[in-house]
Curated annotation (Swiss-Prot):
PANTHER family linked: ANTHRANILATE PHOSPHORIBOSYLTRANSFERASE
Quaternary data: Homodimer.
Organism in which the protein naturally occurs: Azoarcus sp. (strain BH72)
Name under which the protein is recorded: Anthranilate phosphoribosyltransferase
Any Gene Ontology CC annotation: cytosol
Amino acid sequence: MTITAQQALQRTIEHREIFFDEMLSLMRQIMAGEVSPVMTAAILTGLRVKKETIGEITAAATVMRELATKVVVPPPHDHFIDVVGTGGDGSHTFNISTATIFVTAAAGARVAKHGNRSVSSKSGSADALEALGANIMLTPEQVAECVQATGIGFMFAPSHHSAMKNVAPVRREMGVRTIFNILGPLTNPAGAPNTLLGVFHPDLVGILVRVMERLGANHVLVVHGLDGMDEVSLGAATMVGELKDGEVSEYEIHPEDYGLAMVGSRNLRVEDADESRRVLVGALENQPGPAREIVIFNAGVALYAANLVDSIEAGIVRARELVASGAARAKLDEYVQFTRKFGGA
């Protein structure tokens, strides 16, 4: 079922839903550059004001996945995971999700991380990996080779979503959050079936776990720290939406339930990508402090999402062992060295 841009705009103004098939059609038009910048901005604003529905987000993500340049990672996919955040939480912490992938891969998971440069933070995942010396400008085949060899592949979002070129100038000029801010984490080009997904707003926990269910995901934990972080937090309880065995559940976890001390996110803030690198490496080198503890907490949840352990508690125990033994730091070095064989810094 098709819908014109004008009809879609009218629908959003009236706070009515754009149905799934209509949203598929609309997104294909927008991504093909068939909708003018003015109408695109108006529709994106209308969706934001009325609040995007599960169906609208699912349809938009479906189109983004269709158009993405894929990374083909051979099975098995039981322990294949993305650890990703929407960003936009304004916390300016070091790159926690990037540190987490090295612990997760050291445990035997395969991680296909989908990320970008910083928009609002001091250091996006692409910035963090480049600061660590990794070459992130790889072809899809090279990314797949990285995953096979090291257990980690990084997919630089602009390299895999070329259709975004028709939307990027509009988003840049608008300068406000739109549906595209939440589509990135839903559109992993390698199709990782398991995900630890951090979100910037509590309302997104229940919404995005149900979107991931509709998109056919396997095991997903969508998290939001009640102190505002788009990570599993040490500073407050963390809301969790979990998809497992086809069932969705929602609950809260608290650091003290796992024997972890509470620490405010201000203790994890950094000024730039270089400081983020130093803090990240220190955490993986088992230097005591809040950075190490939050990486262990997030990695524990990621190991559970990757089906390597049966509980978050067991994941935290395993993550602590991997950091203490040096395995996580060794995985970082292995990954960086492997990417550099393709050229780059």
